[in-house]
């Protein structure tokens, strides 16, 4: 049996230090994971994310009585060690959804651009009012749905803003991770974002408890 890529979190009483330690652990585990992938491995994971993610978004749209051509979805453009979500965003666009990707501003603010716009023209934070599904990055998530991010505070700022702007309808937030990155507990503060579900290549979309 192969060893787990991430250990069980053992709190030390210093959440700031614990977060720094865990971010280092997750980043190292990601490098180890993707360094071992062949091109076929990466393609298989990308396809799994695309199929499962698209199906889940389609089902969400159907429950809301909407076609995908009326949906706006936030996503992200992954770095090398992040889950390969490019095929998913492409599939969403091909199905008619509008896909927004973040533009990093001064901490902790994000602007947004339409992925279909090659110039990535900023649309302003108010565009979040149009979002129907939020697919977001992260480093790990607890079984309770507490997200560990990169440390910039961008999504801890953005998600409350999203929920305020879409208060009349519940916008689901799904973090996209590698298969090993759901753990019993992560180091967390009260302000850390809580998500509704996780999308992974091996499991598809799985709801997380509160």
Language model segments and positions:
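Glycine-rich, N-terminal phosphate-binding loop of Rossmann-like dinucleotide-binding domains
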Residues: 77, 138, 202
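Mid-sequence acidic-hydrophobic segments that form the walls
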Residues: 118-121, 137, 161
């Amino acid at each position: 049996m192969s060893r787990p890529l991430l250990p069980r979190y053992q709190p030390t009483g210093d959440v700031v230090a614990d977060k720094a330690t865990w971010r280092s652990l997750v980043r190292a585990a990601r490098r180890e994971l993707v360094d071992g992938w062949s091109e076929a491995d990466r393609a298989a994971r990308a396809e799994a994310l695309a199929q499962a993610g698209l199906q889940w978004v389609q089902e969400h749209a159907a429950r809301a009585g909407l076609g995908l051509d009326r949906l706006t979805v936030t996503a992200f453009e992954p770095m090398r060690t992040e889950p390969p979500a490019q095929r998913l965003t492409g599939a969403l666009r091909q199905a008619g959804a509008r896909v927004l990707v973040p533009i990093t501003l001064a901490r902790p603010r994000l602007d947004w651009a339409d992925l279909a716009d090659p110039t990535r023209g900023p649309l302003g934070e108010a565009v979040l009012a149009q979002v129907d599904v939020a697919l977001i990055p992260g480093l790990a998530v607890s079984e309770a749905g507490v997200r560990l991010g990169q440390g910039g505070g961008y999504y801890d700022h953005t998600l409350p803003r999203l929920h305020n702007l879409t208060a009349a309808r519940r916008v689901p937030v799904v973090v996209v991770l590698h298969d090993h990155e759901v753990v019993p507990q992560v180091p967390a503060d009260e302000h850390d974002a809580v998500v509704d579900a996780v999308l992974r290549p091996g499991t598809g979309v799985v709801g997380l408890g509160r």
